[in-house]
Design a protein with these regions (language model features):
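Noncatalytic alpha-helical scaffold of FAD-dependent oxidoreductases
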Residues: 1-464
Length: 464
């Protein structure tokens, strides 16, 4: 796009959106120009901030006429650089932040309809106000927006019970690359009429269309919650504990987290909350929720059995909501503690649940063999197979080399290089290396069909 075309596009966007709807000053644009991890600094032509679906469609049409690429952006909390513009100065960031309305809450049908710019926690609060739960939950829920949550198919803490975001989306409203609007906000649990097209856009990271609203599934609010932290000797014991918890607590399990001893040592070293248990090679944080009154007794039975058979060496069952929050604060403090510890190479991987102990052992061996001095730090959602196998690398160990070692092991176990964070630009080239040529060809055919000019979030998911 030439400078003249660029200038003309900015002028036309300003005329359509007004002063509140377009940012051009460098200081105003700066927060939108770089990803949350600050790995991909960009320089957009401007930031468009439409306030309605109609305005989103108009922005898309104007950008298409000018041949300008569009980078949809919500809360900009993603960890793969999927919402960051490039440095060309020609891309338009399309921020959905002004579209923040909750359009409907149905406590009987258990649905909530929210616009793309609605912050996830705001949607959770709206559900709670009618004694319901929006089960999508993760660390960035106070900043992440519904559109980005859906576009990245976000995971989080409750996937073991409620599934990924994909499983909780009933309907979508999407603006396509030509500016047309597909309105599919049907709040139906059963709808078998034709192709389920909405699932193409869930997890597409803004490369196939711009999500402007979503119908999300709610759940009944459980009356009782049981949260426990257990010290376990190894991942094999944690896996046996998971099986025990499934047998005794069944569908009440809503979180089952595996945490390395190094993780909580880092939390303690950098001023985090106190660990109520003694030092241990590994820990498990498990939470169950139910409206049945016998939940606590069942949780106590699981804890007692784990201690008796030696799969847990110590444990604490929270006596109050405040104590449960303290246990979760340990888990949530790991990322910040890692950042304070120094340079880390992060991995968001998944393998079959039963293979987690063998995967961890194999990855540790591969790192020790090929990158001596690198320190692996594993934690994550054992209950759904998702492990954040992060590596505290030495100064001379390139991130690409670390990724190659870890992803080779992931591939050997039939796993995925991205369990919940998405591909973005951080993993786009790696995705092509790790998927079959037929899978990549199919993805490119879908992209070409829905975005033939390649103007929607180019370079994300699929490399240019």
């Amino acid at each position: 796009m030439s400078p003249e075309t660029n200038h003309d596009l900015v002028a036309r966007l300003a005329a359509r959106l007004g002063p509140a709807g377009l940012l051009t000053a460098e200081s105003d644009v700066a927060p939108y120009a770089v990803d949350w991890r600050r790995l991909f600094p960009g320089r957009p032509a401007c930031v468009a901030r439409p306030a309605s679906t109609g305005e989103v469609a108009e922005v898309v049409r104007l950008c298409r006429e000018a041949g300008a690429a569009i980078v949809p952006q919500g809360g900009n909390t993603g960890l793969a650089g999927g919402a960051a513009p490039d440095r060309s100065g020609t891309q338009v960031v399309l921020s959905l932040g002004r579209m923040a309305a909750i359009r409907a809450v149905d406590p009987v049908g258990l649905t909530l309809t929210a616009e793309a710019g609605c912050v996830l926690r705001t949607a959770q609060d709206a559900a709670a106000a009618v004694n319901r739960v929006l089960p999508i939950s993760f660390a960035a829920e106070g900043s992440a927006m519904v559109g980005g949550v859906v576009a990245t198919n976000a995971g989080g803490l409750n996937v073991v019970r409620h599934g990924m975001t994909r499983a909780n989306v009933l309907g979508l409203e999407v603006v396509l690359a030509d500016g047309s609007v597909v309105a599919g906000l049907r709040a139906l649990r059963k709808d078998n009429a034709g192709y389920d097209w909405k699932q193409l856009f869930v997890g597409s990271e803004g490369t196939l269309g711009v999500i402007t609203a979503a119908v999300l599934r709610l759940s009944a609010r459980p009356r009782h919650v049981a949260t426990a932290l257990l010290a376990v000797p190894d991942p094999e014991a944690a896996l046996r504990l998971f099986t025990l918890a499934q047998d005794e607590l069944g569908e009440a399990i809503q979180a089952f987290e595996l945490i390395s001893g190094l993780s909580l040592a880092l939390v303690a070293r950098h001023g985090g909350p106190r660990n109520p248990l003694g030092p241990s090679p590994w820990y498990v944080l498990v939470e169950a929720a139910s409206s049945l009154p016998a939940l606590r007794e069942a949780a106590e039975a699981v804890l007692g059995a784990a201690l008796e058979q030696g799969d847990a060496q110590d444990g604490v069952l929270a006596e109050s909501g405040q104590q449960a929050a303290g246990l979760w604060a340990l888990r949530e403090g790991i990322t910040e503690a890692e950042a304070k510890e120094g340079r880390g190479v992060k991995h968001d991987v998944s393998v079959p649940i039963a293979a987690i102990p063998a995967f961890l052992a194999a990855a540790d061996r591969a790192l020790a063999d090929k990158l001596p001095g690198a320190r692996p730090n594993a934690f994550g959602h054992m209950g759904d197979g998702n492990i954040h196998y992060n590596v505290l690398a030495t100064a001379d160990q390139a991130g690409e080399a670390v990724n190659a070692v870890v992803h080779d092991v992931v591939e050997a176990f039939g796993g995925s290089i991205s369990a919940e964070h998405g591909i973005g630009q951080y993993r786009a080239a790696e995705l092509v290396r790790r998927r079959t040529p037929e899978e990549i060809a199919l993805a490119r055919r879908i992209k070409a069909a829905l975005d033939p000019e390649g103007l929607l979030n180019p370079g994300k998911v699929l490399p240019l």
